[in-house]
Amino acid sequence: MCQYGESSFDFINRLSAEYGEWFFYDGSDLCFGRPSKQENVELVYGSNISSMNYAMQILPSNADIYSYKSSDDNVLMASLPSVDTTSSLTKTALKRSDELYRKPIKQPAAIRISDQSQMDAHAKVQKGKDAARTMLLKATGDSPKVLLGNNVTIKLSKLSKPGFDDHGEYLVTNVSHFLTGTGSYKNTMEAIPSANEIIPFTAAKPVAQTQMAVVLNNNDPKGMGRVQVQMLWQQDTHQKTDWIRVMTPDAGGGKGKDVSKNRGQVFVPEVGDQVLIGFRYNDPSRPFVFGSLFHGSIASGGGKQNEIKSMTTKAGSTLIFNDTDHTVRLQTSKGNTVHVNEKSGAITISSGSSISINSKNISINGSESINILSPKITIGSLGGEHPTDTVDVMGKAVTVEGEDTAGVKSKALTLEGTDEYTDKGGKYSAEMSEMQINGGSKIAMSSSDTDIS
């Protein structure tokens, strides 16, 4: 609950009305709760009552009250219960009201509700208020004993014989005293049947407007992404809100097993951030975070002609959209980047350490060419956790060139040219423990100097 734009008296007065508690000033004391003892004053029409009238009304008292509890995503509901009253006039008015207004209206609870028992209690209070509003007594008299919160018994003289008829006991809910300069006195009062436990009083609820606030805590104990904030008017008293939710452009859960939580955009404001606070139903007791605000100490804008859009985390990881260059850049604080250039069609990935690509199957396709450049290039592995079984290099023309040396090593080595095989070099050496050369039909060797030994 929140005291908002109201004095302490008005705040307590509003709470007493919302929770169905008595709160009144009897002329000498400020009373909270129904007094344990109430003075009863007898008033006789024609003696100390000069005028009197009864008013009975029917009203839509058939209602369903609801309240949403976000912590467990549950809508609590309750229908207004029947009222046990000893007043025959109140019973008649309620019966006629239910007959006329058969279809229940639906309305949100006037207070914040935590569980079903509190919802049922609130519904009982609302029904009690409706019952008390159906019957009203107005009277003018001259008894100074008529005070706010007292009970009065109304009596009328019998018509055919001496004595008085009792016309019921009433609770004084409003009284005005008038004293003239000549010493004459009178009062006017309003009263309801004393059988009513709840006074039919409704206090105006303040209408909350959007507020600026600073985030004090974002470590939600329930892990729901909520924050605690401090509005500007709470700073001098070091107050803060309860855990409140944060509005985001997209939020929900998955419709299947893939995503059960945090579907959408998850951006929880950081401690110290300035945020804008809104209120459900304009109720100061139901705040939530609209969004975050830049201010003069931290804002730099979107550059010339607002061409730069970006998202940056507190660690410095940044996604930048540059409409001037038509590029998208993902970068970290240490210079690791993924750069997409729409104009040239180029995508560049840069890292100051290493880049790893892991997958069950990987395909690299270049419609024109693929270049792999490095001082040292290794393809495959002979040992380790995942040794390479097969390496295939295929193409219409395959060239392997070493500026200084080129080596091919294996337990079994086969070099095959289906049409022609040529070994060529300035000097050719072959050393083997055993060599066998077979020519199917012909072997020709020629040299200016041939030595076979």
Model-based region annotation:
Residues 1-453:
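Amphipathic alpha-helical and helix-coil boundary elements used as assembly
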